[in-house]
Amino acid sequence: MRSLSSLSLALLAVALAIPVAPALPSSARAASPSAAAERFAIGRVQYTGGGDWYSNPSSLPNIQKQLSERVGIPTEGEERRVSLLDPNLFETPFLYMNGHGTVTFSDEEAERLRRYLESGGFLWADDNYGMDESFRPQMRKVFPDAEWIDLPFDHEIYHCFYDFPGGIPKIHEHHGGPAHGLGLFHEGRLVVYYSYNTDIGDGTEDVGVHDDPADKREMAMEMAMNVVVYALSH
C-alpha cells in the first residue's frame, strides 16, 4: 500500500477541486461557501433502458467510507444519483454505473457523457453480469472511434495504492474465465474503466449480502480504492 503522507493531501485537493468543466464561473465557485465545504461523492449514473442501475445499493456508501478511512478523503455519507442530463453532472468528478440489464443512451445523453469525459471526468462501469451486451455498443455512441483496451498488468491503476501484480481480481463467479479490466482512452488519458467478469460491486456490498469470502471482499475493496485513487490523480 502506498504511503498516505503526501498522497492523501494531493487526492483531497483534487477531489475538492472538482476537475470537470464547471457549471458556474470560477469566481462564483470560489466565493460560494458550499463549494468550500464540498465533500467527495461518487455519482451513480441513473441510465435508461430497463437495467437495474440501482443494484448493489450498499456498495458505494461502503466504498466512500473506506476512501475516508484508508485514503483520507472526506466523503459524503451517501452516493450521489445523477442522470447524464442532470444540470449538476459536471460537478461530479467520478461516475459509477453497474447493473444486470440493458443500458440505453439517447443521442443527447451520449453527447453529454462525451463532453463530461473530455472535460476531465471519469467513469467506472462494473458489469454485474448482463450489462455487457448493451453497454459496449452504447459506449460506441459516446466515442465512435475508440477501442477497448485490456489494460496490462503493469498499468498504474493496479499499483497506485494497493498492488495487484496480476491485474484486476476475480471476485464473484458468475461464469468461467478470467476477469478483465478494460479501458477507453481520450487523448492518452484513461476516461472509462470497465471491470468485466468480476463484479467488484458484489464484493463491496455489506457482509452477508453475497456469498463472497472475506479475502475476496477485501480484494474488491482494495481494487475500488485503486480505481478512485487513479481517477483522482490523473
Which residues make up each language-model segment?
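Short alpha-beta junction capping motif
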Residues: I42, F94-E133
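Surface-exposed patches in mature extracellular/periplasmic domains of secreted proteins
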Residues: I73-S83, A125-N128, A146-D154
